[in-house]
């Protein structure tokens, strides 16, 4: 029986596999489980409560064995974290195809998933955990930064200086919140139930400090707000208790949101349950635990609505908190909007989304070189240039050095081609992988998040992520994934991802141009079809072929 052990991706140019097309997924799988990156690496959990990179350690070892011997005309099939076959394909085909957590409609729920998981037949892949392109908290940082920047522009004159944001959750995703707020010059007070998570965010530079208690947290946050000084502080506690208390005390919040792991009730700590009892209670009495968690979420959301009634800008960050509170009987759960329809959809209409790349060399200098290349290509975009400079100054790498940068249709392929040239010339010490979050413009169906409130009512249509996976497979991506339930939980989302290697070859250049054109192109097409004028303009201006578009 294979057992847990520390995992770390190789660095440098010495290959373990037969080519960079197979070395790349091998290193990124291992990187997902690097102790600097993963939330619970011994359990193969990368982020998001239970999002895993492989089904079990035996499956992990089998995947590694197959990747080290895979040829460039073969494709490895991975079913919910377990390798199930190797097929002869061709050099343009993906080297790996992954399907994670997918269940047929009537069976797409947590109890059925947990039954199958207990039998060893499935795993929960989240979005980038099971697709091997998680880069640590930076992976969600720019999306969170862009959201707060949009709030600042719409409500606070373009800056969060002099504002207080109250939120909760400092896990792999939520940990980006305090830095995203301070990058926008604001103050963040974050509630987190697990002290280890909070101190980890301090260690990685995403959080300024952890307060000794609620009184100190309020005092320091309000002082920084009065001084218009960027600052972030965490308080250890349960959000369902702390947010109502902050409201009761009359703390004036300007913005309120949340990134606890509410997508799975077993990943949300109920009121009255001690941290050390959490895992045992959830595993032994999941139904009772779920009911208590939902009751706590209802109190949490009720407090958020209370802040909204008091004048705060309140939005959901796509973790199903509202839906779970509604299931508990709270009638005003959907009184505040999700972040995508409120702030992000205009970017999706331009094919923009969380494009990212990682340096297989392991050398931070390679990412610094790509930052300079991005500024050279897109330096006229002041907003993007500011992000790249801030990221270079403030973001600590976890595992292999990486960068996230929201680029749109007509931009991603230019970056990919430039990076490939830099590998070929030796300016970069080793190849890069170029991928993205599944939370993208044309790769997800998620009525509680990315596709909430679509103009034509098409929120739940799931053809789009399927088409996206097929398009990327046909375009030359190195590995392609199709998942269910990421971000918002079982029965609530379908989503696809791609990763493509830039190894400096002419073949890689051809693949990169196609994938990094067609992938964001799906976002433009999706939003044209839904009736968005901005998407129609982008399609017309940039030559995206949409039948019937004048």
From Swiss-Prot:
List the GO molecular function terms.
Answer: urocanate hydratase activity
Main subcellular location = cytoplasm
Task: Show the active-site residues.
Answer: 405
Tell me, in a sentence or two, what this protein's role is: Catalyzes the conversion of urocanate to 4-imidazolone-5-propionate.
Q: Which residues bind NAD(+)?
A: 48-49, 126, 172-174, 192, 197, 238-239, 259-263, 268-269, 317, 487
Q: Where in the cell is it found?
A: Cytoplasm
Q: Which cysteines are joined by disulfide bonds?
A: none
Cofactor (UniProt): NAD(+)
Provide the Gene Ontology terms for cellular component: cytoplasm
Cite the NCBIfam families for this sequence. hutU (TIGR01228), PRK05414.1 (NF003820)
Q: Which HAMAP family match?
A: HutU
How many and how are cofactors bound here?
Answer: Binds 1 NAD(+) per subunit.
- Note the superkingdom of the native organism: Bacteria
The pathway is: Amino-acid degradation; L-histidine degradation into L-glutamate; N-formimidoyl-L-glutamate from L-histidine: step 2/3
Its recorded reaction(s) are: 4-imidazolone-5-propanoate = trans-urocanate + H2O
The record, for InterPro entries, names: Urocanase, Urocanase-like, Urocanase_C, Urocanase_central_sf, Urocanase_CS, Urocanase_N, Urocanase_Rossmann-like, Urocanase_sf
Q: What is this protein called?
A: Urocanate hydratase
Q: What is its EC number?
A: 4.2.1.49
